Design a protein with these regions (language model features):
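Catalytic machinery of carbohydrate-active enzymes
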Residues: 1-226
């Protein structure tokens, strides 16, 4: 009789057991990035879009974002299209995922460094030619490199900042990043709104900014805000 862990491992292997498509990643022209999580994660991923677009200006870059972090990409000249994903509601996302499948993406880049079943399910539906991800720790006794769904894993050095770990996903494209600075494109209207909002509290209240991330490797340095 199968234990629960063995049963989950069996279905994980089954879900990720796909055939390899012959395609050179360096010839990709239509790329989808999966980044449907927190605001901070999107902020420290913005260098990836810029460095890829600078190397390949003709490439079409789409991002599957969350409702929470999508506004980080407002006015970003390096992102061509943003789609919204609800993460915990696969059925609600299905129309969008099928639309993405019809786009016939050359490459999908998934940034999770763990094995995430809902990400795998979305990738199976989207069905790109190639999938790039960060090296995975494995799950249910299944090693990350056993997951045949992924065509290319990039490294995750122990003490590296996640910004640089995610920039390394551009290596299969032959891109050597020249900068890891973040991109936030604030309009005059947004700046005016922020100033008006803050004035109602200043100087009565002291306003602080939390630079910490969920993990050490996602912390934003103070000098990076200047």
């Amino acid at each position: 009789m199968y234990s629960s862990k063995k049963l989950k491992a069996y279905f994980l292997r089954l879900l990720t057991n796909t055939k390899t498509t012959k395609f050179d990643i360096k010839n990709a022209r239509n790329i989808l990035f999966l980044r449907y999580d927190r605001i901070g994660d999107m902020v420290i991923t913005t260098p990836v879009f810029r460095e890829l677009k600078r190397e390949y200006p003709e490439i079409n870059i789409s991002v599957l974002a969350s409702k929470v972090n999508q506004t980080i990409l407002d006015n970003n000249p390096y992102v061509d299209k943003v789609y919204i994903n609800f993460k915990n509601n696969l059925l609600r996302d299905l129309p969008t995922l099928l639309k993405l499948r019809n786009k016939k993406y050359d490459v999908c880049v998934e940034f999770d460094h763990s094995v995430i079943p809902h990400s795998i399910a979305r990738l199976r539906i989207i069905k790109p030619k190639k999938i790039i991800s960060v090296i995975k720790e494995g799950r249910y006794g299944v090693k990350g490199d056993e997951l045949k769904l992924y065509d290319c894993f990039t490294d995750k050095p122990k003490d590296a900042h996640f910004r640089d770990i995610w920039l390394d996903t551009l290596r299969p494209f032959g891109v050597a990043p020249k900068s890891n600075e973040y991109d936030l494109y604030i309009t005059d209207k947004q700046e005016e709104f922020a100033n008006t909002y803050l004035k109602q509290y200043y100087p009565k209240c002291l306003i602080g900014i939390n630079l910490e991330g969920a993990v050490k490797g996602k912390r934003i340095q103070f000098v990076e805000l200047e």
